């Protein structure tokens, strides 16, 4: 110990001489203090300190290099210690100071512990631990002195005692100390990095916007995602619950209960529901009208007693049929006018050549599905239209309409000018044009005008020579349907068996002894004149067939003409409807057939 004390005194004297020379050179600094021994607690910022422990009580030897530095705050007072070495080490230090390289290394070792400090701070900016650090790790560590904890001081004391007891292991101890220091430095580096990242996050200046509001460092999206992620299953469950909110009175589904309640208040509580059929109405008047009709098709027109199922159908009927509406919509092809656009679309099918609806029984094609449906009634024999007054059934609707005129007393459509009534609106419209003189349909070939389109088409066949009506018996074709009908009657009488009743036989003057066939007798013997007036030749009912008076006797101008045998007395064909004894021309059927007979007879004379 005496050797170490003497070496320390010599070292102190050398340092004091050096310091005194520096003080004399610097004229701006104050006087050098007389004594260099001070207490352990100093308020000055000391650059170098050398401590030595004697008899367990440390004392300090002060070497002043900064005499005029201001005093520091009391909170920054920290004791600094230096490790003691063996006598041999002290002499080595003296020799090394003569060399500049050794002195620089020594100064770095001395300033190593003085300039480095690591402060561990948590997220709340609270100090957790203070430890050593590397040189130049952070700007704060350069300015603050090194703080040592009590545990580190105890370790150093134990190390100094160990070095005093054994000088042989001095070099080994240095290496171990260096290794420990390296380990501590590595640990402190990690801690400083963590503390620096936390401090940067907490103490970094927040950016400002143009309005001076601070922006948060962490983006708000991350916070929202972090909060939404755990709530995702909960939200899905809520959505599933919302989707199950169904209305009890209708199959509608709602997302929230608010929408369901609103739907109940608006739709079901305010709607008027029929007790019989459950149909809903917005107005009470509509419900009362519906109940008066007993939920059936009984909404009748006051003018024509036509029944409808819906109220808007009745309004449309009143506008169209009874003259309250105008035909504002016209066809682009034929310029035909209609009351509604729906009627125009339905009419456009007539201009197309496609017939997609085909009858499975006979193969006939139609343009409209309704036409096929009506046609199929011919094969099935079904009569879906029933009269409510007499329970008579009909195959077509227009037949029922014609039949209803018997119960009503007049037909549905009546002319206000002449009082003539019609069962179908088509015939009524054609009749009204006779009063107005309107003939909108003009023949493209000759320019003749007609009141209806069917009449114009019928007239056009005279120019084109078209004969669309073939006979099923002989295959002959005709231009008009009435001509085909007359031809069928003629063919039927030619092919029928000859069974002439005695009431219809015409007496012929022949010799009783020699009976001769009527074919020969008609050519040689004179016959009484026959009145060709068809009215006088027809006996009372049962009326013979209208064509029975034709070709009974040949004319004298045609001697080679063979007479046709008489035809049996057949009843006339029944009328199409009981309530419609008139044909399409408005004449009696018998008169019409007689007119045809006269026409044919006159043609034969010529």
Curated annotation (Swiss-Prot):
InterPro entries linked: Znf_C2H2_sf, Znf_C2H2_type
Compositional bias (Polar residues): 137-149
Zinc finger (C2H2-type): 245-268, 272-294, 299-322, 329-351, 357-379, 385-407, 413-435, 441-463, 469-492
Subcellular location, record wording: Nucleus
Entries under Pfam families matching the protein: zf-C2H2
GO cellular component: nucleus
UniProt keyword annotations, A-Z: DNA-binding, Metal-binding, Nucleus, Phosphoprotein, Repeat, Repressor, Transcription, Transcription regulation, Zinc, Zinc-finger
Extent of Basic and acidic residues compositional bias: 71-97, 171-183
Region (Disordered) location: 71-113, 130-235
Biased segments, Acidic residues type: 98-109, 152-170
Chain residue ranges for the region called Mediates interaction with CBFA2T3: 498-606
SMART domains named among the record's database cross-references: ZnF_C2H2
Subunit structure: Interacts with CBFA2T3.
Protein name in UniProt: Zinc finger protein 652
Organism of origin: Homo sapiens
Taxon lineage: Eukaryota, Metazoa, Chordata, Craniata, Vertebrata
